[in-house]
Amino acid sequence: MLFRSDITVAFRVELPELFTITSAEYEAIHSAWAKAVKVLPNFCVVHKQDWFIRENYTPEIQKDDLSFLSRSFERHFNERPYLNHTCYLLLTKTTKERSRRQSDFSTLCRGFIVPKEIQDKETALKFLESTSQFERIVGDSGFIKLTRLTGDEITGTPTQAGIIEKYFALSQYYTTSLQDISLAAADMRIGDNLLCLHTLSDAEDLPSQVRTDGRYEKLSTDRSDCRLSFASPLGVLLSCNHIYNQYIFIDDHTENLQRFEKQARNMHSLSRYSRGNQINKEWIEKYLNEAHSYGLTSVRCHCNVMAWSDDAEELKRIKNDVGSQLALMECKPRHNTVDTPTLYWAGIPGNEGDFPAEESFYTFIEQALCFFTEETSYQSSPSPFGIKMVDRLTGKPLHLDISDLPMKRGIITNRNKFILGPSGSGKSFFTNHMVRQYYEQGTHVLIVDTGNSYQGLCEMINRMTGGKDGVYFTYTEENPIAFNPFYTDDGVFDIEKRESIKTLILTLWKRDNEPPTRAEEVAL
């Protein structure tokens, strides 16, 4: 995609499901991103754009073969709100000139917008080669899947909206309509929606340390950790309509360090006039020492959360929620009211080159990547066989295959299930739910019930099938369980039947450590 003098390659990103990644796996994902970013040429922009849209669950009650319980399940979750996550990755090749521009410059003011660097075929080919390497490195990690978007998926067709049109409409629907954009002194409005923007654009607003992942206290215990990425509070844990933009600007690393060396010398010369100059000089030297000691690459970074609502009162609550989530990351919440139009304009897919340089801060690739969200919401299994479960965060129903699909992917080697929990935690309730759906999909189910937990389910199935299925054998003193091993429907005793009777008699007659003699076997 060629947009505003820049070349952009767009991907749809499939991230791992939340609460399914360990700390070591988060490190592996972070390492894969870092390796991929390093293959990109200078003056590239890595823009990861995560959409989180509130939607309501639509029940599947139109199917004719639904049982009473399945239909009741669907009706119970009708209109259940949940957060739908869509992730895009945009790799943009810009120029040195555009990467340094401030917010007071826009390509809208230029007559000819394609610079000489982009017109060079060799530059374009090298960039496209590096994006292919980027895609391969990230895909080889085994945790993230990148799917390159086509031209129609970016710009849209007469019948379906592309990602650019969706961005202008603040929607992820394929059939959407463009909205009027209104800019006022105090706010920005798109259609009926009011926007609010929180930014991470200054190193002073950042925590003293960043990390790849952290402990999610609500689902962790003293003996086990539930891990989420460092930036997860701005992702699936923020339950409102919002876009989380993450930018990494790759400049000329050598030139950056030379500029910092010059600044350090200037600060040293002015240190006797101000203690602040001396402190700045020490910070710059620490940055340079880190870069030289560990071979780190100097980049610029920016993150922002763009949230919206059509209700002014709800928007106030959203502002507080975003600020609270930033505080959970130990970041200083900064509600930006001045640069909302500029940053919204720079967030258009393909327009990353128009990002205002003063809204970014210098860091290294590894630290910048810690601000990437690395998980998505739970997804339904593609397998036709499975059971209905619900998302533990929002309660949205999901179709999950916990037997065949994990076996096919090599996650498990058998289909055994071990259900563990204290008394009253719902073990029998879940098993009733599981075996009932397995039965409805044609599975033969045999249960040894020691507490009559499944008698009600069997009686219901027995009534539905007219006694064909749902047969329940139980023991009472008046009517103990008994069977005649010598009975056959046709009165014919084949070899298999005779062997089973022989085995039964030996089991009842002999002990485990008392093998039968040859004469006894012949007699039988």
Segments predicted by a language model, with ranges:
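Glycine-rich phosphate-binding loop of nucleotide-binding enzymes
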Residues: 23, 31-38, 385-474
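Hydrophobic alpha-helical scaffolding
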Residues: 117-120, 124, 274-277, 308, ...
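Extended, folded cores of ATP/NTP-driven motor/assembly subunits in large transport
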Residues: 1-375
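Conserved structured core elements
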Residues: 23, 27, 128, 299, ...
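Beta-sheet entry/capping signal
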Residues: 8-10, 43-47, 86-88, 302-304, ...
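Glycine- and acidic
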Residues: 13-21, 116, 300-308, 412-420, ...
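Switch/coupling segment of Walker-type NTPase motor domains
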Residues: 49-51, 56-60, 75-80, 433-524
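An acidic- and aromatic-residue-enriched active-site/binding cleft used to recognize and process polar
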Residues: 16, 49-52, 92-94, 310, ...
